[in-house]
Amino acid sequence: MPFGNTHNKHKLNFKAEEEYPDLSKHNNHMAKALTLEIYKKLRDKETPSGFTLDDVIQTGVDNPGHPFIMTVGCVAGDEESYTVFKDLFDPIIQDRHGGFKPTDKHKTDLNHENLKGGDDLDPNYVLSSRVRTGRSIKGYALPPHCSRGERRAVEKLSVEALNSLTGEFKGKYYPLKSMTEQEQQQLIDDHFLFDKPVSPLLLASGMARDWPDARGIWHNDNKSFLVWVNEEDHLRVISMEKGGNMKEVFRRFCVGLQKIEEIFKKAGHPFMWNEHLGYVLTCPSNLGTGLRGGVHVKLAHLSKHPKFEEILTRLRLQKRGTGGVDTAAVGSVFDVSNADRLGSSEVEQVQLVVDGVKLMVEMEKKLEKGQSIDDMIPAQK
């Protein structure tokens, strides 16, 4: 939980060795990168809004990670965190994002017309398609560190911006605190709303403070374009629909997102972005595009194939269970999405999903007929 600066000064009465966390049983990127030397060097630093090294790492100290799943183990409290604590963040970013170096530049491409295909994924296998990203509003602390006033200001700005959208994007904001339990649960079950903050990662990082104050969901009239306000990021923008038309989902995503960005810019509140990290977000795993383009796809045979994991890796895709992170697949339906966020563009990342899923559906159809797919195994992308 973020503390005031005085608390950090109080800690300096103890030697770095006495304050250094025990990370001996940890499996996360932070624990791998945080040496005693780095801890010594950074522990008395703080960002202009008062975020400290211990605030950055607390979630990773409290959640050692999973023997098979490498979590990130740290968060940013504001835009400056990535600069002030770069000695810790840089190796974590390099490790998490396939060797992305401190000197590398990210690229952005939100021109949906650059996507090839994507309108012909077989709906008998691809049940739904979704693209999401996060955005942070410049000048405000991020959710692990923002005050109640800041969070409410972000909500007010966001609602004003979103309510000015027209046409296919015309919609309405639903604050969490005025929803009944049933309404909330229904939206969660329909995959429209974020879960209640029970995740230890959310809790330990301070993101769940004052819940549900100033949190909510905005969506257009036909629920195909949604914005979450003040969950893990200031904004999470989501375009989704049933079936396999990823081309249309991505078009709506790009157009809606750029409209929102334009409105915020005009109001004097651009999104946090720089040419090294792309869009700046709370979790280092989302830096770059912040984009996750995913489909729910039925792969009853391919998922039992001994090379399933290898095929995903070669296609630069990752799988989750049907309900998202840390859940099991129900009825052989997997949530398959791009593994990369940083160093490649939005179009490139969605292209990998479209091409990879198309290939996997073709493999699935061959396996149904009892045919071999050995000649279809892709090379590493």
Swiss-Prot record:
Keyword terms of this UniProt record:
ATP-binding, Cytoplasm, Kinase, Nucleotide-binding, Phosphoprotein, Transferase
Among the record's GO biological process terms, what is one? response to heat
Phosphagen kinase C-terminal domain span: 125-367
Q: Where in the cell is it found?
A: Cytoplasm
Reaction(s) catalysed by this chain, per the record, are: creatine + ATP = N-phosphocreatine + ADP + H(+)
The molecular function terms in GO held by this entry are: ATP binding; creatine kinase activity
As for what it does, the entry says: Reversibly catalyzes the transfer of phosphate between ATP and various phosphogens (e.g. creatine phosphate). Creatine kinase isoenzymes play a central role in energy transduction in tissues with large, fluctuating energy demands, such as skeletal muscle, heart, brain and spermatozoa.
**What interactions and quaternary structure are annotated?**
Dimer of identical or non-identical chains, which can be either B (brain type) or M (muscle type). With MM being the major form in skeletal muscle and myocardium, MB existing in myocardium, and BB existing in many tissues, especially brain.
- What's this protein's name? Creatine kinase M-type
The species is Bos taurus
Which gene specifies this protein's sequence? CKM
